[in-house]
């Protein structure tokens, strides 16, 4: 039967069913096609892509209204379909009811209940027109069905029932399809809305970022411009001070040059004096020559002192100039101190402003806390006022209130502002709505499942629905009871809370008034401080005028000084250049004052802006407080409404029939709501703009705080730099003090030199007077010397000119070196600052990374929670649609806030609601924390942007420094090329460079102005931000490359400077300065290496930071997109919630008691109107500001194109700069190659210079030696002539070398040392001469003794009486011994001449006599031989008697010699004296010289035993007296004479050998003492190393011991020879061998002495020339001695080693 009924009902309702199938219904097909087309267009709009994210956001923003329209149309179509479905189900229910009544046994009641439950679902007012149309159609179809029922019979009813069952199945399938389509459409719409919201939020975020970036860039650029001005002024002042110091050093160097000229004149005078001395030495005797030379040296010193006195006057002039410069430096220091004080005052005031701002912020925060506390209390009171009954009463008066509100909204468009304050409230509502919609969607899913199992479980569902209805009715009753209880409590507490609100608001108003008064006071104080600063600036102007007057007076004085300097011979152009520099400094000081005024004006403007910003902040904080209170109220309302919705669900089935009556009223309300929704959208936009403004203002305040902190740090850094500059100035002052001390020492030295010069000039005049008669003889010599002197003077004048030019160049290079050192110091400071900033950036990036990770976690949790909420919202969407309008009106009408504490009073039946509320609260907390994190991230991004701007400014500074360095490089290259040109060319080049600098400065100023203009117009869009970020990265890379190139350029510059320094050192011959500059170069190279390492580390850090920043930005963008999607979902849910609230309000309006609540709510509405009026005024102001912001936004959009164009230009400029950098690299490579070549040449020149300086010293020493030698001996004239030729050659060489030298400036200390060395050297020479003279005197005395011995021998030959002869010889010897003083040597030589003549005559007579005697005695030879034979036994007896006495003595001597001999002294060299040939000569030769050798024996013994002259003389006399007694006793005259002559000759040879050995030992002793004295002097001056000194001292000690041993052996041998005069051949041979070995050892010691002297000279001078010179000097002394004492012996050694040359010549004559 059931199947039959179903088939019959399908047939009966087929005509109706066919009209509702999509295939047969054109209306459904059109709707579905329209929906599909709209969905496709939306998908196309959303999937449209763009080049960048910013353009995509812009495109979405432009297409937003189109998408909104499509969404609205799609939603309306969906609502129409849903309403159509609802009506069809209602009609089917009615038809089913009829069939059930007609056929109760065949049909079930499930269909009716199901259709009722499904039809009870509400729909929105936006589709009322479709509802009306569908309603009319359904009524017609229902009337037709009634007619059919009335007319048809039971059979037709059965068929219709069957057809209806079939149609129900088809409707269920269609319903499922429609639900699936609906869900798909909803998902698409939500996705589209998410994307739209993301795009909108991205645009807003980018706008905010751009605004922040604009503000921060403006502020930072202004601050950087100010700081750059301050830094430039400080650098200019420092450079001016350095230039003045350089001018002072230049003046001092001029004084040094003048002193050097005087010293050169003194040297010329000394040369003239030396030439005069040479002339005098030819004409005067040896004694007078020594005295005159000593007097001349004294007179030279006095004349030099006079010249130094003359130089004192010029030095005083320079001292006055230095004092004037010091006064200028002091004035500049005072100005710097004043400026520092002004800056410190500004810093203090700035800190005070910051403190006041922080205090105000704290007070504002306290006020906000108080306001929040009050609002929470108000909410707690207002929550209890809101009850379900009051809301029902409001719903009854809904129509009236809506009319009133419509009129108010028509008259007052400012009602939009109320919704601005409710923006945050709406977000929380949207969260609640999301939960409700998720519940709604879940219920929809459940309803669909119920429809699937409709036929099988219809009866069970009916029972469940009836039970649910009963339970809900009970719940409603319980709610009514609770509401009645709550009304009493709320009425009692409402009054208390109102009073507390009034009190709290009055207190807060008083606090705000006090804060405003404090702000006004602070403003007045700041204005007073600005006035003080203006006064200070005026005082600074007065001081500047005073400085100008001082500068004018200084210029006049300086012109006078220039005249004086021009009179002295200096160039006044350098002084005029310094005057120009002073004028430039004055102009720069004026610019500084103007800049300070501008800074003061800017500070006042900023203070005014701060006041206005504080006022705006106060107003905005008030608005925020009100909005927060309203948000809390709306939250509580939403909670109450949710509770009511749950209580009213049970009543929906009963109220569904009554809804038809209210449809007409809803149509009117829907029209009004549409208008309100449009207004609401406009207000939402304005509210979003206002929120953006609020956030931008907050960011601005934070940016100001950061900027103030940045300014503080920059001020502290500037103060540090100033302190460093002050310390450098102090160092410069110390240097000036040292220079002044040196200058005073030079003055003293100069006075001494002047005195010496005057004395020398006086001496020269006296000598010229004394030598007037002798000039005729020496005219030729004078002419040659004068020509040489003229050439030398020309060379010296030419060298002086070159030295002056090189000195100026040296000073310029020194100034440049100082400037480069200052630049290096500044760059080191900048590098340290960059390192600190990078370190802070690293820390901040780490913080950002941590925050981003935390935000990711929070966002993940939020996403999960949002998904859950979306599911719940989908369940509750259908239920909340009917409540939206009522809730919206309730929010408008009540405006009362509820407390969260009401959750505690919820009953057990409402546990699900409390749980939902708890989830909402947790979601709110998570959203607030997410908002806080996002806000913090935005602030940190703003800080990063400020740091990026700072880095950009640093890059600009580096570019400016690079330009300056390029200019310096060009000027230096130009100077290197133009060194040989005249001063006019240099001045023209300087003018051209100045003009170029002025042009480039103008260009830089233009560029800066353009940059400021562009920065003012800078947009905050993401496109420009990304482009700027890329440009910033490129500029960072360029700056790094520039830094590297700059470091390489600095290396090149340092190399060039080292080359220049080395060249200057070559010219000046300053080995010490050469070492200093090399060490400086090595230090600078190390610093450059460190700098390169730091730059590389900074590059790595910056790249890492960039990567981290990019990742953070990507993450932030993703998070912003997600948050925007969530916000859009919340907004959509809020709209649905409002619609649901409206419908629930309508339903509650019918249930509640209307009369009681109407009166109460009318009073509240009046109060709300007053509040609306107050808020409207504020909203109008905000609307105006929003319009202004829109205008600014359009302007910023226009600026964007300009910025992109400028960025392209900047990229082109960067490319050009890269090309220039490549060129500079090529130039640097060329310069480095040239530098290496110059370094090699410099090293060669240094070696050559040292060699020449040593040669100069050697020549000066040699001149003194040759002068002393020329005055003492005649033969030194030839040596002096040879050395003059050598000197002339070397002077020519030196003149050629001096042309290549760059400078001959010698510092004061080196001059003093040289003078001390020359004085010490002269003293040593005097001591040597004295020692030589003391050595000559005993030689002369010995010659006199020899001559007298020859006289004695001649007298003996002429047969004088023996006794008288001995007495006379003794007297003569005593006289000679007593008269051999050093002063009477020349007198003795003069006295020897007549004695020699007498000796010659005596020898001639004696030769004739002997020849006659030999002819006579031929007959007596036999008799004589017999007599000799008789005498020989006697002699043998006497010899045997003497031998025992001699042998022990000789053994003792032999043992002593063996003990004292040193094996190291035994060398197998040739002897200085030839071996004696014993007794191989003939008897005639012995007979000729025995008298002479006998007399020489006495003289030799006298000289050897100088300590005991009387004893040796007596012994000689004893021997002489002994011989004549033997002759008289034995009466053998001729034979005895022959024997005695042989013995005496042998003895004389031995004594002569011993005498020569003693002389050589004495010379060794003198040289040892000289070397010891030199070593002591060098040890005091620390010229030698300790190891060298130890070696030389040890060698000298060994030499001294060996000399003392040889002296002892020589004395012993001489004593033995004297005591054993008649010794035989054996003993004589022993003595001869000992003397020979002693002479060999002495030769070895002489060679060792020469080696030691050479080593000492090498240590002193470091060259071999010195050693050769000293060797030649020592050899000249030895040669003189040999020539005087043993010259004849050397020649005699070649020819049988005869004793004396004069006697040998006499033998030849025989």
UniProtKB/Swiss-Prot annotation:
An example Gene Ontology molecular-function term: actin binding
Region (Disordered): 113-159, 1409-1448
Coiled coil listed as a keyword: yes
TM regions (residue ranges): none
Pfam families with a match to the protein in the record: KIP1
PROSITE patterns: NAB
Keywords on record: Coiled coil
Compositional bias segments (type: Basic and acidic residues): 122-137, 150-159
UniProt domain NAB: residue ranges: 13-92
Any one annotated GO CC term: nucleus
Coiled-coil portions: 152-446, 474-546, 579-883, 974-1021, 1095-1259, 1285-1336, 1559-1665
Similarity comment: family membership: Belongs to the NET family.
Functional summary from the UniProt entry: Plant-specific actin binding protein. May be part of a membrane-cytoskeletal adapter complex.
UniProt name for this protein: Protein NETWORKED 1B
Source lineage: Eukaryota, Viridiplantae, Streptophyta, Embryophyta, Tracheophyta
Gene (name only): NET1B
């Amino acid at each position: 039967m059931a199947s039959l009924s179903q088939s019959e009902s399908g047939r009966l309702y087929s005509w109706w069913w066919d009209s509702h199938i999509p295939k047969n219904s054109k209306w459904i097909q059109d709707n579905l096609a329209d929906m599909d087309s709209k969905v496709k267009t939306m998908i196309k709009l959303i999937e449209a892509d763009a080049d960048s994210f910013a353009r995509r956001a812009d495109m979405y923003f432009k297409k937003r209204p189109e998408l909104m329209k499509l969404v609205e149309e799609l939603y309306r179509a969906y609502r129409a379909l849903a309403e159509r479905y609802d009506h069809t189900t209602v009609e089917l229910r009615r038809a089913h009811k009829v069939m059930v009544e007609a056929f109760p046994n065949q049909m079930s009641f499930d269909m009716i209940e199901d259709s009722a439950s499904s039809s009870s679902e509400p729909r929105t007012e936006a589709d009322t027109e479709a509802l009306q149309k569908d309603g009319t159609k359904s009524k017609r179809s229902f009337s037709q069905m009634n007619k059919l029922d009335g007319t048809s019979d039971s059979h037709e009813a059965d068929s219709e029932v069957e057809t209806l069952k079939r149609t129900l199945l088809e409707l269920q399938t269609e319903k499922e399809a429609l639900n699936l389509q609906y869900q798909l459409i909803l998902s698409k719409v939500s996705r589209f809305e998410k994307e739209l919201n993301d795009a909108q939020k991205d645009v807003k975020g980018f706008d905010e970022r751009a605004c922040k970036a604009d503000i921060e860039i403006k502020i930072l650029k202004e601050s950087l411009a100010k700081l750059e001005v301050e830094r430039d002024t400080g650098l200019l002042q420092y450079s001016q001070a350095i230039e003045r110091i350089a001018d002072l050093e230049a003046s001092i160097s001029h004084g040094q040059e003048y002193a050097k000229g005087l010293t050169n004149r003194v040297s010329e005078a000394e040369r003239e004096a030396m030439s005069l001395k040479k002339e005098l030495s030819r004409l005067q005797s040896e004694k007078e020559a020594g005295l005159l030379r000593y007097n001349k040296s004294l007179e030279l010193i006095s004349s030099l002192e006079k010249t130094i006195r003359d130089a004192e006057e010029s030095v005083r002039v320079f001292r006055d100039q230095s004092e004037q410069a010091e006064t200028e430096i002091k004035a500049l220091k005072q100005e710097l101190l004043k400026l520092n004080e002004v800056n410190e005052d500004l810093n203090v005031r700035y800190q005070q402003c910051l403190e006041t701002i922080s205090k105000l912020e704290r007070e504002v925060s306290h006020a906000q806390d108080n306001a929040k506390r009050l609002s929470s209390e108000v909410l707690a009171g207002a929550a209890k006022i809101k009850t379900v009954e009051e809301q029902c009463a409001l719903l009854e008066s809904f129509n009236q209130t809506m009319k009133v509100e419509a009129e108010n909204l028509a008259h007052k468009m400012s009602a939009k502002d109320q919704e601005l304050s409710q923006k945050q409230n709406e977000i929380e509502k949207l969260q609640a709505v999301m939960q409700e919609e998720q519940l709604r969607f879940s219920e929809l899913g459940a309803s669909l499942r119920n429809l699937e199992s409709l036929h099988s479980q219809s009866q069970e569902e009916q029972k469940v629905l009836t039970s649910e209805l009963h339970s809900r009715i009970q719940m409603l009753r319980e709610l009514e009871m609770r509401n009645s209880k709550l009304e009493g409590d709320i009425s009692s507490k409402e009054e208390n809370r109102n009073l507390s609100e009034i009190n709290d608001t009055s207190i807060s108003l008083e606090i705000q008034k006090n804060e405003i008064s404090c702000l006004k006071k602070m403003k007045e104080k700041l204005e007073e401080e600005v006035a003080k600063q203006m006064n200070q600036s005026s005082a600074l102007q007065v001081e500047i005028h005073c400085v100008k007057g001082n500068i004018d007076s200084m210029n006049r004085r300086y012109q006078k000084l220039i005249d004086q300097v021009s009179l002295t011979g200096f160039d006044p152009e350098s002084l005029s250049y310094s005057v120009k520099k002073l004028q430039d400094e004055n102009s720069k000081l004026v610019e500084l004052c103007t800049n300070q005024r501008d800074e003061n004006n800017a500070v006042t403007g900023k203070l005014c802006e701060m006041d206005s910003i504080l006022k705006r902040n106060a107003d905005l904080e008030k608005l925020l407080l009100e909005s927060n209170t309203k948000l809390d109220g709306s939250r509580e309302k939403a909670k109450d409404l949710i509770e009511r919705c749950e209580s009213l669900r049970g009543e929906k089935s009963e109220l569904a029939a009554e809804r038809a009556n209210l449809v007409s009223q809803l149509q009117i309300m829907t029209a009004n709501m549409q208008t309100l929704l449009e207004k609401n959208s406009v207000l939402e936009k304005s509210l979003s703009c206002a929120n953006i403004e609020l956030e931008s203002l907050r960011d601005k305040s934070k940016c100001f705080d950061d900027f103030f902190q940045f300014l503080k740090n920059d001020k502290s850094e500037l103060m540090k730099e100033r302190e460093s500059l002050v310390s450098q100035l102090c160092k410069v002052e110390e240097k000036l003090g040292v220079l002044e001390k040196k200058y005073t020492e030079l003055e003293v030295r100069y006075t001494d030199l002047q005195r010496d010069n005057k004395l020398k000039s006086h001496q020269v005049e006296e000598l010229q007077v004394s030598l007037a008669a002798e000039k005729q003889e020496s005219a030729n010599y004078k002419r040659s010397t004068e020509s040489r002197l003229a050439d030398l003077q020309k060379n010296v004048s030419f060298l002086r000119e070159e030295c002056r030019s090189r000195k100026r160049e040296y000073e310029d290079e020194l100034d440049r070196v100082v400037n480069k050192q200052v630049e290096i110091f500044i760059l080191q400071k900048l590098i340290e600052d960059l390192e600190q900033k990078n370190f802070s950036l690293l820390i901040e990036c780490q913080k950002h990374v941590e925050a981003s990770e935390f935000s990711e976690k929070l966002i993940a949790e939020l996403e999960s929670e949002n998904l859950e909420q979306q599911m719940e919202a989908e369940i509750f969407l259908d239920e909340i649609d009917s409540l939206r309008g009522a809730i919206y009106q309730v929010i408008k009408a009540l405006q009362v806030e509820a407390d969260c504490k009401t959750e505690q009073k919820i009953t057990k039946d409402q546990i699900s609601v409390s749980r939902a509320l708890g989830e909402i609260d947790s979601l709110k907390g998570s959203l607030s924390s997410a908002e806080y994190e996002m806000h913090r991230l935005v602030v940190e991004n703003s800080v990063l942007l400020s740091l990026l701007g700072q880095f950009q400014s640093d890059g600009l500074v580096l570019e400016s420094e690079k330009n300056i360095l390029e200019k310096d490089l060009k000027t230096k290259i130009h100077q290197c090329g133009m060194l040989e040109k005249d001063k006019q060319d240099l001045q023209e080049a300087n003018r051209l460079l100045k003009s170029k600098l002025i042009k480039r400065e103008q260009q830089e100023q233009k560029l800066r102005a353009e940059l400021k203009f562009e920065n003012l117009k800078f947009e905050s869009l993401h496109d420009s931000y990304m482009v700027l970020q890329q440009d910033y990265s490129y500029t960072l890379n360029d700056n790094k490359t520039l830094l590297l190139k700059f470091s390489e350029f600095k290396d090149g510059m340092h190399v060039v400077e080292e080359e220049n320094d080395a060249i200057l050192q070559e010219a000046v011959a300053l080995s010490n300065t050469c070492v200093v500059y090399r060490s400086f170069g090595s230090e600078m190279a190390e610093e450059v290496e460190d700098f390169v390492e730091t730059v590389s580390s900074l590059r790595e850090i910056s790249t890492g930071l960039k990567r981290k920043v990019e990742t953070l930005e990507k993450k932030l963008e993703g998070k912003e997109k997600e948050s925007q999607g969530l916000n859009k979902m919340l907004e959509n849910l809020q709209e649905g919630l409002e619609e649901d609230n409206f419908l629930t309000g309508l339903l509650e309006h019918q249930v509640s008691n209307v009369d009681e609540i109407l009166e109460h709510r009318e009073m509240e509405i009046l109060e709300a109107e007053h509040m609306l009026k107050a808020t409207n005024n504020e909203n109008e102001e905000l609307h105006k500001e929003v319009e202004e912001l829109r205008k600014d936004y359009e302007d910023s959009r226009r600026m964007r194109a300009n910025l992109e164009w400028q960025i392209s230009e900047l990229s082109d400029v960067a490319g050009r700069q890269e090309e220039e950098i490549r060129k500079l690299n090529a130039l640097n490579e060329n310069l480095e190659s040239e530098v290496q070549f110059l370094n090699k040449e410099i090293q060669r020149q240094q070696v050559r210079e040292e060699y020449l300086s040593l040669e100069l010293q050697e020549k000066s020493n040699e001149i003194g030696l040759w002068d002393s030698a020329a005055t003492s001996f005649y033969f030194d004239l030839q040596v002096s002539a040879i050395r003059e030729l050598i000197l002339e050659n070397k002077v020519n060489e030196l003149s050629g070398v001096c042309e290549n030298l760059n400078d001959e400036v010698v510092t004061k200390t080196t001059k003093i040392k040289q003078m001390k060395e020359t004085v010490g050297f002269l003293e040593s020479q005097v001591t040597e001469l004295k020692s030589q003279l003391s050595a000559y005197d005993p030689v002369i005395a010995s010659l006199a003794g020899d001559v007298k011995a020859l006289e004695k021998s001649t007298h003996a030959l002429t047969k004088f009486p023996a006794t008288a002869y001995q007495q006379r010889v003794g007297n003569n010897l005593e006289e000679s011994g007593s008269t051999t003083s050093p002063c009477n040597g020349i007198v003795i030589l003069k006295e020897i001449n007549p004695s020699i003549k007498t000796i010659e005559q005596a020898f001639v007579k004696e030769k004739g006599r002997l020849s006659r005697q030999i002819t006579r005695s031929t007959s007596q030879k036999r008799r004589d031989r017999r007599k000799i034979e008789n005498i020989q036994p006697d002699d043998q007896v006497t010899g045997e008697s003497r031998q025992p006495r001699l042998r022990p003595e000789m053994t003792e001597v032999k043992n002593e010699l063996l003990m004292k001999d040193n094996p190291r002294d035994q060398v197998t060299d040739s002897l200085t004296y030839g071996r004696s040939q014993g007794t191989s000569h003939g008897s005639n030769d012995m007979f000729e010289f025995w008298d002479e050798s006998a007399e020489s024996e006495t003289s030799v013994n006298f000289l050897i035993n100088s300590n005991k002259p009387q004893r040796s003389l007596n012994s000689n006399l004893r021997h002489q007296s002994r011989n004549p007694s033997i002759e008289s006793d034995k009466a053998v005259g001729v034979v005895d004479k022959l024997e005695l002559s042989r013995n005496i000759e042998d003895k004389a040879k031995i004594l002569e050998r011993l005498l020569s050995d003693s002389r050589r030992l004495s010379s060794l002793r003198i040289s040892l003492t000289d070397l010891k004295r030199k070593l002591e002097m060098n040890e005091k001056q620390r010229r030698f190393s300790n190891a060298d000194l130890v070696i030389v001292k040890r060698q000298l000690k060994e030499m001294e011991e060996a000399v003392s041993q040889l002296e002892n052996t020589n004395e012993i041998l001489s004593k033995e020879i004297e005591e054993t005069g008649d010794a035989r051949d054996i003993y004589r041979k022993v003595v001869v061998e000992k003397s020979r070995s002693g002479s060999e050892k002495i030769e070895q010691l002489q060679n060792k002495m020469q080696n030691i002297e050479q080593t000492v000279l090498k240590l002193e001078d470091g060259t071999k020339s010195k050693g050769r010179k000293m060797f030649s000097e020592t050899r000249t002394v030895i040669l003189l001695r040999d020539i005087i004492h043993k010259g004849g012996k050397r020649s005699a050694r070649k020819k049988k080693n005869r004793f004396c040359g004069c006697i040998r010549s006499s033998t030849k004559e025989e």
